[in-house]
Amino acid sequence: MYLKTIKLAGFKSFVDPTLIPIRGSMNAIVGPNGCGKSNVVDAVRWVIGETSAKQLRGQSMSDVIFNGTTSRKPVGKASIELHFDNSEGRIGGEYAKYGEIAIRREVERDGQSNYFINGAHVRRRDVVDVFLGTGLGPRSYAIVEQGMISNLIEAKPEELRVYIEEAAGISKYKERRRETESRMRHTQENLDRVNDIAEELAKQLRHLKRQANAAERYKAYKQEERALGAQFKVLQWKALDHKLSEHDQAINQKNTRREEKQSEQHRIETEIEKMREQLTDVNEKHNAVQKRYYGLGADIARLEQRIKDTQEKIHQWQSELEENENVWEELQNNTAECEAQITELETELEHLKPRSSDIHSAAAEASKELAQAESNMARWQEAWEAFQAETSQTMSQLEVMRTKREHCERQLTDLEKSKQQLQQNLKQLQLDQLLNEIAPLSSQSELLNAELSDSQSKLQSLAETIASRRDANQTTREELQTQRRELQALEARAASLEALQKAALGESDGKISEWLSSQQLKENPRLGQKLVVNPGWEIAVETVLSGFFDAVCVDAALPFLTDLTTVSEGRVTLVEKKSVSASAFDKAPTLASQVKSEWPFQQWLAGIYIADTLDQAKQLQSSLQENESVITKEGLWLGPHWARISKLQDAPQSGFLLREQQLKQLKANILGQQKKCDEQEALLKSGEQQLNQLETDRDTLLQTYQKLNAEATTVQSALSTKQAQLDNAQQQQTRLKIGLNECEQQIEQCQQQLTLIKNKASSLDDSQGLLATRREEMIRERDHYRTQLIELREKAHQKRKEADELEIRLASNEDQLSLLRQTVARDQRQLKQLTERREMLSQYLSEGDKPLEELNEKLQTQLEQRLILETELREVEKELEEANQLLRHLEEKRVSTQKALNEAQAQLEELRMQRQTVSVRQTTIKEQLSENDFDLEQVMAELPEEATIESWQEKLDQLVERIQRMGPINLAAIEEYESVNERKNYLDKQHADLTEALEILKNAIHKIDRETRAKFQETYDQVNQQFQSLFPRIFGGGRATLEMTDTDLLTAGVIVRAQPPGKRNVTIHMLSGGEKALTAVALVFSLFQLNPAPFCILDEVDAPLDDINVGRFCQLVKEMSKEVQFLVISHNKVTIEMADYLMGVTMQEPGVSRIVSVNMQEAIGLVEA
């Protein structure tokens, strides 16, 4: 596996996409300081997973992106890609099958990085995993910088150990161990959660068991309620059946009355139907007469309209005939006028046509003479333009000479002034004064910088102290939160126990509490709280005294005896604080001997012996009197002829004494825990005060630092200003001397040039006089040609004008003649049409009176017929009115009958609706019984004879009251109990699985530790051996070794012991810079010989070495290049000569790096050739 290429784009100074080919095993990068060589090292470190901006010489990850220059804008993204040849398959895992692997990292301005392997988006961890065990990594020994040399050799033992672990390839083991520990931690957390959940589920199971029993009783009551409800519904059904019979009888009566009204209505409707038929006949007769009447009226109207239209036509024909005669006469006159004009125009045209030919010939001759004159004028214009060009050139040269002379004269004046100014400026420069001012400013700046450095060190130390104090405060705060959580848990447990104790003492009984409050006994102690029982006998005491735990302790019971009868519900026991004599029993120890209290209780424990075992109790039972008994620790209570044991887990008094002891212990623990919280709060408060004081000190010191910094900046600015003034003055002095010399030379040159210009200007003045004479001759010639041209143009224009006017007159006469001929033809056609129309109109008028007389006669006949029809129509309308009146009377009678029928029908429908309602209620009851799986007939058969609705309603109410007294019932308690029980079993199984998994993970940790120890020991021995071998080769003698700081191979650090030749044993810190560098090189190469990384980057490692040690260093690198690919950055010629390929980094454009590559073998061959 070896590196093939490095692609950079937008990374630091490599703004343009840049490809760096890595050829062979020895490559060197050279270039001046600041050109970007080390940016290549940063790029490689960054792409293989470096996350610290400080390691990349930046403040944030976005600093690696090109930030722009004076001529280039910043870019938004940086990208680096490394190409590896993996043909040997050294990179294992899923990428072992790839012969070439490309790893790319990109970052944008938001600082978010993206990683790619062979183009696929991956995580940073995937990139780091690729190089695990190969010796490559962002902090591995494969990338060695100049600063890293001293860091490596002076590293802490635990930091130096990391390099040996990387060489051993056990970094993947450590990663696996971290993952395993993380899984163990998560498994343990899961196990703790399972334990907590299981404990909570156990409590839920006990609670749900009680709820499930109540649910069973509730179901039994509900079943009884269901049976009674079914019988009650059957009773209701029977009552509804009786109502149904009554409704059927009433419906039959109403139905008979409705049928009577229907018969009467049918008769009336028959009469109405007959009257309607009669009315229809009369109506048809009326319609027929009316139709004839209105038809005749329409005929009369049409005749009247025809008469009117005929009269209008006759009037129109007469008007048209008169207009026709007027137009005919006008057309006759117009035709005569047009024929006269035609004769006149034909005569004029015969005289104009011969004259047109003569005028056109004269115009052509005038145009020819004009063309000759224009040609003469054009030739003169050409000659004039040539003369003007020659004159212009002479004038231009003369003007140039005048301008040059004026320029030289002004230049001479300016140069003389500049010379005087330069001489004056040289005298004004004050170099000595600036040097005197710079010296004290420089001393003051050095003093302020020293003070700033001291303040900065103090600020750094104070910042570390503040960070440490903050961490301590955070630890205290976390501890306080833990203590508070524990206190809250204790208080919650105590509250729970107090609630149980209050329930056991009857304090939750509202009526009893009210009575005690009324007697001011609410705060009096209870007997159960005043008993102290010897350990082990709590169950026995609870068995005997459980009914007296809630007894109220009073000084005297007598004052309350009268009010005891006012207790409405519940039980109240009062105990007086008096001594009670107890009978002596000597058969065995008594139960009273196991109880202590200042309140009397012996009367309730009199005659009760105790026995440790059941056998002892049996022995005592045979000798017991009637008022004696014996009880065991387990609560088995035996009398002479009886035995009792109480296991009422649900009873409030169960476990009362144990809970009381636990409650007392919890209260003591709460006080202790509260004290711990107070101590932690005080400690946190003290830490916060210290932190505030430290921050105040830091702010004060920061103000001092800022003040010093501002003062130093001011002094440095003044120093820079004075230094710049000095540099400027020195540069100005040099420039003034050079300028003075140049000014004198320019004055001499300018004087010589002015003499030449004056001579040439005199020659041009002579030429200008000759040109003026020639100009006057050409102007006289131009005036002659211009006068001749004007005369000929006027003549040609006059001839063309006469020809045009004659042509226009001829064309106008011909057009007018054609138009007149067309007008005469059109008028003759109109005269013919008017004659034909006049004859037709005369014929219409002669025949128009006959149709008008016929129409008037027909109109008179139809008017007489309309009068007859009017009389007949009035008679028919009278007959129709009489029929309608009779029909209305019958309709009114039918409406009254219909109203009575509707009332009867409504009453019938009301009865039917009532019957339907009863029937629906019956059906509903039957359906309800069916839905509840009851059969009506069966329930009716089983129903007792004495059953009534009232008695069954009373039974149901009583049963419902019993159910209500049970209070809220969790019907799902049975299923919840089974579900929680199933979950509890599952959690028990999960607990076993987690315990097994935890054991497996612990075994895996032990195995990883064994492998790590073995691998580390083996690697350590080999590296130590190689280090002891390489050190003398590099130093030319001496010895060195590695030592472990501890015997534990998992945590032991590694230190370096080195003794250069000729020196006694010294610590590594006493070596010189060159000796440290050589020692570090020996150690790095020892690691490489054991586990060679794919490539090694050496960044100016040879800088602190002299020539002899550089030679040794190069010889060693040359030998190792047979196994390892090297990329060396150096300024040393010896190191550079060793490389096979050279790559130069240049910065021709400020802030932008570029690569130039040279093959050394080819270059040497070219030189030798």
UniProtKB/Swiss-Prot annotation:
Its main location: cytoplasm. ATP binds at residues 32-39. InterPro entries: P-loop_NTPase, RecF/RecN/SMC_N, SMC, SMC_hinge, SMC_hinge_sf, SMC_prok. GO terms for cellular component: chromosome; cytoplasm. Residues 170-507, 659-1030 form a coiled coil. One of its GO terms (biological process) is chromosome condensation. Pfam families: SMC_hinge (PF06470), SMC_N (PF02463). GO terms for molecular function: ATP binding; ATP hydrolysis activity; DNA binding. The keyword NADP does not apply. It is found in: Cytoplasm. The keyword DNA repair does not apply. Keywords: ATP-binding, Coiled coil, Cytoplasm, DNA-binding, Nucleotide-binding. Required for chromosome condensation and partitioning. Belongs to the SMC family. Contains large globular domains required for ATP hydrolysis at each terminus and a third globular domain forming a flexible hinge near the middle of the molecule. These domains are separated by coiled-coil structures. Homodimer. This is Chromosome partition protein Smc. The gene is smc.
